[in-house]
């Protein structure tokens, strides 16, 4: 347990940031799962919409520093390849 005031503040900030990052990472996972489910069903129009949604979430999270920009680009590339297989 921190004693110094600044250390206590750092603990509070870390807890807030951890919760915020966890929330965004959960959004990413959810968007990817929804996309993969639609791809598995073979619905092209809905898959395209889910791909756009997932790409948007990945770009936003990379911009906010939650994931690295290269990881976001790699994930988007993987999802696009999956989409192109059914399109």
Curated annotation (Swiss-Prot):
Biological process terms in GO annotation: translation
Disulfide bonds: none
Record has Lipid biosynthesis as a keyword: no
GO MF annotations, alphabetized: small ribosomal subunit rRNA binding; structural constituent of ribosome
Residues of the signal peptide: none
Presence of the UniProt keyword Secreted in the record: no
UniProtKB keywords: Ribonucleoprotein, Ribosomal protein, RNA-binding, rRNA-binding
A GO CC term assigned to this protein in UniProt: small ribosomal subunit
Family indicated by similarity: Belongs to the bacterial ribosomal protein bS20 family.
Protein task: Binds directly to 16S ribosomal RNA.
NCBIfam families: S20
Name of the protein: Small ribosomal subunit protein bS20
Lineage per the UniProt record: Bacteria, Bacillati, Bacillota, Clostridia, Halanaerobiales
């Amino acid at each position: 347990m921190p004693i110094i005031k600044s250390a206590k503040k750092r603990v509070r900030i870390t807890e807030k940031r951890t919760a915020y990052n966890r929330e965004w990472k959960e959004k990413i996972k959810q968007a990817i799962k929804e996309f993969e489910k639609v791809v598995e069903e073979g619905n092209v129009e809905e898959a395209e919409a889910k791909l756009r949604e997932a790409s948007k979430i990945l770009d936003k999270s990379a911009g906010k520093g939650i994931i690295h920009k290269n990881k976001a680009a790699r994930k988007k590339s993987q999802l696009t390849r999956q989409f192109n297989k059914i399109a």
